[in-house]
C-alpha cells in the first residue's frame, strides 16, 4: 500500500515493468504446472497486479518514430504476456492485437536479414532474441478464444502511440504445420536466423565474442550457466546456448540441439 503501482523507482522504466510482468507470469505458470493451487484472495490480488502492469505498459510505451530498440521490444513482449493471461475484455483485446502487430513490425526493423540484432552487440542480440522467441511461442499457444481477439478487437479503443491497425490481424500458415498464426513466413525465417547468428558468433570455447554493449540483461533466466572461478561458482554471461535452445523449441533442428547441448532442454520445452 505504501508503494502503489506506478510509483517509485521500480515503475520508472517501462522495460523493467514489462520484464517483471512476464517473469511473474512465467513463475505463476511454473507453479501451476507442478500442481500448485492458489486461493481466491490471492488470485484477486494477483490479477489486479497483472492488470496494473498492463495499464502502465500500455500508457508508457518507450516508442520513438526513429530511435527505438530493446526497450520498446520488451514493452511489447511484456504487454503480450499480460494480455495473454488476463481474461478477454475490450481493453485486453487491444493490448493483445497491438502487441502482436508491433512484434511483427519490430522483428523486421530490429533484426537484419541474416538474423542479427541491429544494436551491434551479441549480448543485446540474446536479450532481444529471447523476447521474440518467448513472445512468439506464447502467441502460437494461445487458445481459440484468445486468437479470436485478433479479429474482433476495436482499434478505436487504443489511445496510445503508435496507433493500432484495424482488425483483423492477418493470419498465415505456420511453416511445416497445419496451424495458422499472425506470423508470416519471413518472420519465422528471421527468427530461425537469430539462432544461426548466435552460433556463428560463438567461439570454440563456447563463449560469444564480446562485441559492443553487455549489461547481462535477460528476458528470462531459466537455467543460468556457471563456471568456477577461484573455487566459487560465477555466472558465465557469454554462454548463449540457452537462446539457441529456446529458439529450437519452434524449429526442432538437430544442429541447434547439438549446439545447445543437454543443459538447456528446459528452455526448448518451454
Spans of model-derived segments:
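Active-site lining segments of carbohydrate-active enzymes
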Residues: 3-137, 141-144, 156
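Carbohydrate-active enzyme catalytic cores, enriched for enzymes
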Residues: 123-270
